[in-house]
Amino acid sequence: YILSFIKLYELPFGGSITAASMLPLLAYGYMAGPLWGTIAGFVYFLLQLTQGLYFLTPLQFALDYVVPFIVLGTLSGVFRTKNTAFNLYGGFALAVVARYLCHFVAGFVFWGEYAADYGFNSPVLYSLVYNSFVLVDAIPCFILISIPAIKKLFRRLPKKQKIENAEA
């Protein structure tokens, strides 16, 4: 959450490129699994409310604020059953793309009227481009998990399954 205050670029209608602020939530979702990742995503959403928000309707609020953070925590751990590079990268990629799709739909449906103000003839193209901040924001996350020492750390981290078995 603290990393989300390190904004490298802030967009005019919300959203920003940060210093890998998604990484802790993605990592927790990967380590703890979808259930605990969902809970962490919801808590992360609540924390994000302290940074201010602007919304038009409850559906837009859900698509721009609630669902994107929940899917980051939930989907990052869906492939975590084995310690392979695909499981880590696949879960992270799925989570990031799902977050992007949430923002894209909200941008197209609710913010598309601003497309012409920014030189776009199409609300779809406008939303695709405007919300690409999510993909740019994900690049440092993928770079960091590609560093051999960090990749090795992820492989060694306990998964929730192993923790539950040890308690039994």
Residues of each region from the PLM?
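Alpha-helical transmembrane segments and their cytosolic interface
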Residues: S122-A168
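Short helix-perturbing small/polar motifs within transmembrane alpha-helices
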Residues: Y1-I2, A40, Q60-F108
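Hydrophobic alpha-helical transmembrane segments
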Residues: L23, P34-F42, P58-A62, Y89-L94, ...
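Hydrophobic transmembrane alpha-helices
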Residues: Y1-M31, W36
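Juxtamembrane/transmembrane-helix interface segments of polytopic membrane transporters
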Residues: S4, H103, G107-A115, I145-I150
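Structural signal for the C-terminal ends of transmembrane alpha-helices
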Residues: Y30-A32, T74-K82, I147-R156
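Small-residue faces within membrane-embedded alpha-helices
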Residues: G29, G37, G41, F45, ...
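Interfacial aromatic-anchored transmembrane helix boundaries in multi-pass membrane proteins
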Residues: L3-I17, F42-G77, E113-A115
